[in-house]
Regions:
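N-terminal secretory signal peptides that target proteins for export/translocation
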Residues: 1-13
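C-terminal motif of bacterial Sec signal peptides marking the signal peptidase cleavage site
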Residues: 27-29
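Interaction-mediating elements
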Residues: 31-328, 360
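Flexible glycine-/small-residue-rich
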Residues: 50-52, 152-156, 167-169, 236-240, ...
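Short beta-strand elements
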Residues: 131-139, 212-221, 333-340, 461-468, ...
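Transmembrane beta-strand segments of outer-membrane beta-barrel domains in Gram-negative
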Residues: 208, 360, 410-591, 631-632
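Outer-membrane beta-barrel initiation region
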Residues: 247-424, 496-503, 511-521, 539
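Extracytoplasmic gating/loop element in the C-terminal half of outer-membrane beta-barrel translocons
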Residues: 584-633
């Protein structure tokens, strides 16, 4: 009893503290300058305005501001500052310590940082070709708070009058002068970012062609703005220190290197001696394998997922692809690739692999609440990430739940699922779900599938082809009361509690225009799905003499009608960036499902619906749309 009282008091104190904190935040929101020293000001708001120019969005310039206001929620509420202001001057108090720890101290206005911000903004505008840009500031001071605005007048930008290339190496000159791929042209607006991207393009192309030691930092630009009004001459050339090297030193830089051998080090420890009994090594066709303990992956599997091949030229793209391919293998946690020069024009490639957890077991227990019914659920999962020593990933999950219903009944559900993923992006899944409601029905659901996933990350597009999608719903028992109330011929729910087969295939994909290099630009997300079912079975029904249901006239497989339908879904989301920390999101869904042939309605699990705790809460789950109906139950 004493223990219970103690815990209860602790919980009560925590609840009281949270309530007081909430009230304090609301009250302190009106006194944001509580901890602002006398004679100083709180930086309340910072804005950036660019006059009559859409080439340089204000959102892209915010990152150059050296001092920003306190963090805001919903664009106006400084919640963390409000929490901080609930603290008292006595820092020893527990509530004061936590308020200062959770909250955010006020940002004190600094004129020095304003000057630094103006310098950075001026430099950013210069990099975009606006060398005559003017940066001004305006301040509004009220109640010891400062609202600060940066006003940028770009004026006319400079353009490139003449772009020239002066490089000693013929291969390098050929790459830089390639008009098909170059990013810099005469007449374009001067842009330091594009010039830097051109350096990266030239250097990357050289490294793809075998020039291992070539780097973008070896290239430089010289600009002359005295040639014309608001015009610049730009010349690409080698860095001064490169031009001063001897011919032999230049030859090392402009030499094509080949891969001699590829070394795989699996769980390699350089402190172990070669004669260590737990360390093993083997070699084949230019590949060398070194591992400690039990071999992690088959050698053929590693070779298949390594685009870097002995005898090939060094290629930067192949290095990136090797990183991507090896990191996708389930048992591998860490990948590191390095190169060692072993002769005048040869490199050895060293790939270090570190294994992750091969086996994982998880368990969970939770309380559930659905449509007014309380329950309890427990689940267990097992994952093997290297089932056949070929990076195959097996996942097995089981879950059981017990629910107390408002009408005094109960519901039991048990389900198990298994999925086997192969490195080739093929996955096989199986599942079984058992539902028992003693006052209503008993239902079993079997499903199986075979799918292939194909990703194109460079354009933000993923594809998923589901070659086999099988579902079998079987209800061995339905109570008479439930049948009379819900399953009359005029009630739409009747079709939700019928045995049926679904044998289909489908394709789905998703696309995003988000680019990590431009995180503050607005972007689209698109998801689409196409699926059909029953066409193959309907084509085989007549020649194979399938049974025909006498009541509906539909074909049956194993005394069960199979569904035939087509379905298409599209989901579009547009993220309008208002500020680096704020965005407005528009979302639209469109879907159509058409039964035909062997079906008069869409199967229950493939229908569209709304309602429920996680949807439109005014309606119970699956009782809202699309369309409407009036059941007789």
């Amino acid at each position: 009893m004493q223990c219970y009282t103690s815990n209860s008091n602790k919980v009560s104190k925590i609840v009281q503290w949270l309530f007081c904190l909430f009230c304090g935040v609301i009250l302190c929101a009106c006194n944001m300058t509580k901890f602002v020293p006398r004679g100083q000001y709180l930086l309340n708001d910072v804005k950036v305005h660019v006059e009559d120019n859409k080439d340089v969005p204000a959102a892209d310039l915010v990152k150059y501001i050296q001092q920003k206001e306190n963090t805001e929620i919903l664009g106006f509420w400084k919640l963390q500052l409000g929490i901080y202001n609930t603290a008292s001057l006595d820092t020893a108090k527990w509530t004061s310590k936590n308020a200062r720890k959770i909250g955010e101290a006020p940002v004190i206005f600094s004129p020095e940082l304003v000057d630094a911000s103006c310098t950075q903004l001026k430099r950013a505008m210069n990099n975009k070709g606006y060398f005559r840009a003017i940066v001004d500031t305006t301040m509004q001071v009220k109640d010891r708070k400062v609202n600060l605005a940066y006003h940028i007048t770009p004026n006319e930008p400079y353009s490139i009058r003449n772009y020239s290339i002066s490089l000693d190496n013929s291969e390098l000159s050929s790459v830089a002068q390639n008009q098909r791929y170059t990013l810099v042209h005469n007449g374009m607006q001067f842009d330091a970012d594009i010039l830097n991207q051109e350096r990266l393009r030239v250097a990357s192309t050289m490294r793809r062609r075998g020039y291992f030691y070539f780097d973008q930092e070896m290239l430089q630009y010289k600009a002359d703005s005295t040639r014309g009004k608001q015009q610049i001459d730009v010349k690409m050339e080698l860095q001064d220190y490169i031009q001063m090297l001897s011919d032999e030193e230049k030859e090392n830089i402009f030499r094509v290197y080949k891969i001699a051998r590829v070394h795989f080090h699996i769980d390699y420890d350089p402190t172990r001696l070669p004669e260590d009994k737990e360390m093993y090594a083997s070699s084949r066709d230019g590949y060398v394998f070194t591992w400690v303990g039990k071999q992690l992956l088959r050698e053929k599997m590693l070779i298949r997922n390594c685009p870097i091949k002995p005898g090939d030229r060094y290629n930067e793209n192949l290095v990136e692809r090797t990183y991507a391919r090896l990191n996708q293998l389930a048992p591998i946690k860490y990948v590191d690739i390095s190169f060692e020069q072993i002769s005048v024009d040869e490199l050895d490639c060293h790939i270090v692999l570190s294994r992750g957890k091969l086996n994982t077991i998880s368990a969970e227990i939770e309380g559930t609440y659905s449509a007014g019914d309380w329950g309890i659920a427990a689940g267990v999962g097992y994952v093997n990430r290297n089932l056949f020593r070929g990076a195959e990933e097996l996942s097995v999950d089981g879950r059981g739940s017990y629910e107390w219903r408002q009408n005094g009944g109960r519901a039991i559900e048990a389900k198990v699922s298994a999925e086997l993923k192969f490195p080739s992006a093929i996955a096989i899944d199986l599942g079984y779900n058992f539902q028992n409601r003693p006052d209503e029905y008993t239902r079993s659901i079997f499903n199986a599938g075979l799918e292939y996933t194909f990703k194109q990350p460079h354009i933000g597009l993923n594809h998923q082809f589901r070659f086999v999608d099988i579902s079998y719903v079987y209800l061995p028992w339905i109570s008479d009361a439930f049948r009379d109330q819900f399953l009359q011929s005029t009630n739409i729910l009747k079709y939700s509690y019928e045995n049926h087969f679904i044998v289909g295939l489908g394709y789905s994909g998703n696309y995003t225009s988000f680019r990590a290099r431009q995180p503050h630009r607005s972007y689209w997300n698109l998801y689409y799905n196409l699926e059909t079912a029953g066409n193959l079975l309907r084509g085989l029904a007549k020649p194979l003499h399938f049974n025909i249901d006498q009541e509906s006239g539909n074909y049956e497989l194993f005394n069960t009608q199979f569904a035939q339908f087509a379905k298409a879904d599209v989901s579009v989301t547009y993220n309008q960036m208002l500020h680096p920390k704020h965005r407005l999101v528009f979302h639209a869904d469109l879907g159509v499902a058409i039964p035909y042939g062997n079906s008069q309605t869409i199967p229950f699990e493939k229908r569209y619906f709304a309602g429920g705790a996680n949807s439109v809460r005014g309606w119970s789950a699956r009782t809202l749309g699309p369309g409407g109906y009036r059941g007789n139950g």
